[in-house]
């Protein structure tokens, strides 16, 4: 693109959601997950690894390329809008769905407008350097420069008779509202049609903010029911035991009500962030509608199913109609690798290698689908891939990746424009240090982010080998009820209990709160790259990262291993 601004070129500014706003510019070149990255109670950035850490977004015009990470960011933004703590406008230079959906729901269901604008990269860079920006329906202004804003896209959307009937209210006001939101999102995504989905996975059941409950109960009260069979993500409490665990009523009650609202709408109370472990897991080529970032990435990458990374709230809308915008990775051409990442494979790796590589792969491909090369000889297990996908989702906005020799669609030809980058051993050592900046002394070991599989539970019991944790170090595993039941049948659960391990259903590390999260904890140890990234912001505690064996060592000694792993030394 020329450095000069042309009046004959395609519009440089596109309105995604119209509105008027002004404020100081808050700019970053790094995407941010609003869930786990922004405190809905204050509007401050809490992601300790992000350049904007500590900045309050309230009232500012936020310039960032796109969002990343959690699908729950839409709920956080909706809550910020409803409480008056949101940025005054969002300005992107790449496609973005999660925050856009939150702003769309605010406008559609609560009559609260927050402008969302997309600029070309050059204009984005120029305007992001301004001190103050103002936006109205037709223009964006900064530093004496005024740029016309093109209206929202109005591409033709081919609806079938059933779609149109839902849109005019045949199936009630809740379905009509759901279809209105789907059609609006399809327009901004450039979709020309909708696609049938066979199942959904609901992420909006996590009590990330009061807005999640407000939305769900409003849809339930309007008579909303899911049309596509839909599982539910982990929730924010142990549903049957939260009162006995001492969870305050003012948190436990709305968290439980939120889960109940989705069950009332026909969702299955699976309460797991690892739905790919359920018997209902989809097959290759199956079009589904999942939310929860790690699940979306695993479904596309490992199972070969097809799903966009649907934001919270859109997940329910699609489940209620059985229809999703036909865009993104629902289309085979859009599943091709857009970047090639050559990864160094050291000798003697352990399980910590995989989340570390996932974390770095997301940084290497923050906004596109990568093909990882060099890992096939290591023959990663499904749990290795699970850990990699979850960590990848913290640092990338992409809904999938490919791993040569390990994932089913890795043979898709990369785009002709795909560049090649590398992940070196030096990169791994630097990332290891980044995720291990806490003190050596730990009071908690956190396993199960995402929810642990039966094989992970067995592996943990095997490493403990009958030994018992230190009395002053809690060890907590979060897992889905189906996995816990299976672990109970084969003796694994009893072995873990004998070692002093607590196994909790329903909630996960991304939603756990005090006092279930041990209040005396100052630092914790985890084998999850995802929780190593989000944990400091979510819990306010320092985090150490390592292998499953490192976690058991910490449980036995109260100290994190203070060295690089042998395979990085």
Swiss-Prot record:
| Highest rank taxon of the organism | Bacteria
- State the active site: 70
BP-aspect Gene Ontology terms:
proline metabolic process
Regarding activators and inhibitors, the annotation says:
Inhibited by Zn(2+). Inhibited by pyrrole-2-carboxylate and its derivative 2-thiophenecarboxylate.
Q: Which UniProt keywords apply?
A: Iron, Lyase
Alphabetical list of Pfam families matching this protein: AcnX (PF04412), AcnX_swivel_put (PF01989)
**Listed InterPro entries:** Acnase/IPM_dHydase_lsu_aba_1/3, AcnX, PMDh-L-like_dom, PMDh-S-like_dom
- Which molecular-function annotations from GO does this UniProt entry contain? lyase activity
rRNA processing among the record's keywords?
A: no
Q: What class of enzyme is it?
A: lyase
Keyword Lipid biosynthesis recorded = no
Catalytic activity annotation:
cis-3-hydroxy-L-proline = 1-pyrroline-2-carboxylate + H2O
Under Enzyme Commission nomenclature, its number is 4.2.1.171
Q: Which cofactor does it need?
A: Fe(3+)
Q: How does it assemble?
A: Monomer.
Annotated family: Belongs to the AcnX family.
Task: Explain the purpose of this protein.
Answer: Catalyzes the dehydration of cis-3-hydroxy-L-proline (c3LHyp) to Delta(1)-pyrroline-2-carboxylate (Pyr2C). No activity with L-proline, trans-4-hydroxy-L-proline (t4LHyp), cis-4-hydroxy-L-proline (c4LHyp), trans-3-hydroxy-L-proline (t3LHyp), D-proline, cis-4-hydroxy-D-proline (c4DHyp), trans-4-hydroxy-D-proline (t4DHyp) or L-serine as substrates. Involved in a degradation pathway that converts c3LHyp to L-proline, which would allow A.fabrum to grow on c3LHyp as a sole carbon source.
Q: What is this protein called?
A: Cis-3-hydroxy-L-proline dehydratase
* Organism the protein comes from: Agrobacterium fabrum (strain C58 / ATCC 33970)
Upper taxonomic classification of the species?
A: Bacteria, Pseudomonadati, Pseudomonadota, Alphaproteobacteria, Hyphomicrobiales
